[in-house]
Design a protein with these regions (language model features):
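ADP-ribose/adenylate-binding Rossmann-like module
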Residues: 89-107
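Conserved Rossmann-fold cofactor-binding substructure of NAD(P)-dependent oxidoreductases
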Residues: 58-69
Length: 444
C-alpha cells in the first residue's frame, strides 16, 4: 500500500499531514490532500513533492468515488457527520478508513459489511476520543495483569490556553471548535458514583462542578461529560463502582458560563427573529423580562443573582455582552450569536500557545489493600498552527495510518484502539513527540 487520501485540511490536520509527508520518502507513499478550499489544502502541502492538493466537495459523489478508487487508505478529517458518507464509499470499494471521531451509529452499522470485505474502519484515534482510550486501557490492563480489581475511574480532559498566554478574565480561549464549546453538556449527564447512578440535567450542570489540583498548573474545575457509563463496556470494567469522565476549565469559568445557560442563550434549536439587527445588549435583553425602569444590567442581576458577584459580572462585561454593538448575523440561533460574540474576544492571538491537560485517576484493590493511581498528561503547543490540540489529534491518527499501511494492523470492521497491539505502539511513539503521561501511585 502506498497511496493515502486525506479529506479535510483544517486546523487539526497540520501534524497529521506533516508526519505522513515526512515519512513518505522512506515508505514510498504518495499523499493526496482534498479540501473545499484548495488554498487550505495547498497550504498544508507546502509544495512537498510527495503529495498533491485538490479542491474536494464531499457532496460530489463522483469525485468521492474517484478519489477513494485512487487510494489504498483514506483519512477523513471532515466534520464528524460526514464520516459515514466516506465510510460507505470506502467499504463499497474495499478501502481502509481512519478518523479521529467517535464511532457513530451510522459508522457502527457498517461493521459487518466492512469485516466481510476485509476493510478496517479505524475510529477514535485523536486525543479525546483516542489518547484517552489508549492511555486508560494501558492502565486498566496493567492493573488487571497484576491481579488488581478496579473500583473507580475518573478521567478529565481540557483544551485550554497556556498560562503564559492567559490574559483575560475567563482564563480561557478557543483552542478548538468554538461551536462544541458553546453547546457542551446539553442533554442529561449520567455517571456512576460509589455504586449509585447520578443524573444532572443541563440547567444544573455548571453548578455541579468539582475541583482538582494538577501540578504545576494549579486548580481546575471539572464538569461531568454526558454519558460516562458506556465506557464500562468498552473498557471491560462492568462491575466498577465509580466512573466519571469530565471536562476541565480554570476555576471560575463555570459560574460565569452558567449565566448564559440559565438565561437560555446557549439554545441552538430555533432562530431569533431579526437576528441580523440585534446588538449585543439587545440580544442579552431578549432573555430578560420587560421593565422600562431597570437597566439591562439591573435586570440581569435580579433574574440571575450569580451575576451580582463582581468577578462573574466583570467576566460578562469584558465579553462585551452589554455593548450597543451590532452582532451582524442573520437567521441565527441564540447559540450562534453567543458564539460570534465570544469568538471576537476569546480567539487565539498570533503569539498564543495552548495547553492540553488529561488526567486519569484509578482506584483499585490488590491483596486486600486499596490504591490510587494517577496518570497525567500536560502538553503545551508550539504556536497557533502547531497547537497541542493539533498534535494530539493528528499524530496518533498518523501513527495508526502508518501501522495500517505497513501491515501491522490486521483488525477489520469498525476498530477502536483499545487493544495492546494497537495502543502500545501508538503511545510509545507519541512519547517521541513529547506526548507522555506521568504516573504516580499511593496506598489509600
Amino acid at each position: 500500500m502506498s497511496r493515502i487520501l486525506i479529506l479535510g485540511a483544517g486546523l487539526s490536520s497540520t501534524n497529521l499531514i506533516e508526519y505522513l509527508l515526512g515519512n513518505a520518502p522512506a515508505y514510498g507513499w504518495t499523499i493526496r490532500i482534498g479540501d473545499l478550499s484548495l488554498e487550505a489544502a495547498a497550504g498544508k502541502l507546502g509544495g512537498n513533492p510527495n503529495g498533491q492538493a485538490f479542491k474536494f466537495d464531499i457532496f460530489n459523489a463522483e469525485q468521492l468515488s474517484a478519489e477513494v478508487a485512487w487510494a489504498d487508505v483514506a483519512i477523513s478529517m471532515l466534520p464528524a457527520f460526514m464520516h459515514p458518507v466516506v465510510a460507505k464509499e470506502c467499504v463499497r470499494q474495499g478501502k481502509h478508513l481512519l478518523t479521529a471521531s467517535y464511532v457513530s451509529d451510522a459508522m457502527k452499522s457498517l461493521h459487518d459489511e466492512a469485516r466481510q470485505k476485509g476493510v478496517a474502519l479505524m475510529n477514535e484515534l485523536g486525543v479525546d476520543p483516542g489518547i484517552d482510550h489508549m492511555s486508560a486501557m494501558r492502565m486498566i490492563d496493567g492493573i488487571r495483569n497484576k491481579g488488581g480489581r478496579i473500583t473507580g475511574f475518573i478521567s478529565n480532559t481540557g483544551g485550554l490556553i497556556a498560562p503564559e498566554c492567559d490574559n483575560n478574565p475567563w482564563n480561557y480561549k478557543f483552542t478548538w471548535n468554538p461551536r462544541n464549546v458553546v453547546l457542551a453538556g446539553q442533554g442529561v449527564t449520567h455517571f456512576l458514583e460509589n455504586g449509585e447512578h447520578k443524573y444532572i440535567p443541563y440547567h444544573r450542570l455548571y453548578s455541579n462542578i468539582r475541583t482538582y489540583n494538577i501540578p504545576p498548573y494549579g486548580e481546575f474545575e471539572m464538569y461531568p461529560n454526558r454519558d460516562s457509563l458506556k465506557y464500562r463496556e468498552i473498557y471491560g470494567i462492568n462491575d466498577i463502582q465509580t466512573i466519571i469522565r469530565g471536562t476541565l476549565r480554570r476555576s471560575g469559568y463555570s459560574k460565569a458560563w452558567d449565566v448564559f445557560v440559565q438565561l437560555g442563550m446557549t439554545d441552538d434549536t430555533y432562530k431569533m427573529e431579526g437576528s441580523e439587527m440585534l446588538t449585543k445588549r439587545e440580544f442579552l435583553n431578549s432573555f430578560l423580562p420587560y421593565n422600562p425602569t431597570e437597566t439591562v444590567e439591573e435586570k440581569l442581576q435580579r433574574v440571575i443573582p450569580a451575576a451580582q458577584d463582581k468577578i462573574i459580572f466583570n467576566k460578562l462585561k469584558w465579553l462585551g455582552i452589554f455593548d450597543n454593538e451590532l452582532i451582524g448575523m442573520a437567521n441565527a440561533s441564540p447559540a450562534q450569536l453567543l458564539q460570534r460574540i465570544m469568538e471576537e474576544k476569546l480567539g487565539l492571538e498570533p503569539n498564543d500557545k495552548d495547553i492540553l491537560i488529561m488526567q486519569h485517576i484509578f482506584d483499585y484493590e490488590l491483596d486486600g489493600k486499596k490504591f490510587q493511581k494517577k496518570s497525567t498528561l500536560t502538553l503545551v503547543g508550539e504556536d497557533t498552527v502547531h497547537t497541542a490540540m493539533a498534535k494530539t489529534v493528528g499524530t496518533p491518527l498518523a501513527i495508526a495510518a502508518k501501522m495500517l499501511m505497513t501491515g501491522q494492523v490486521n483488525d477489520r470492521g469498525v476498530v477502536m484502539p483499545i487493544k495492546p497491539h494497537l495502543y502500545n505502539p501508538i503511545l510509545n511513539e507519541l512519547e517521541e513527540y513529547g506526548v507522555k503521561f506521568v504516573e504516580e501511585e499511593r496506598q489509600l
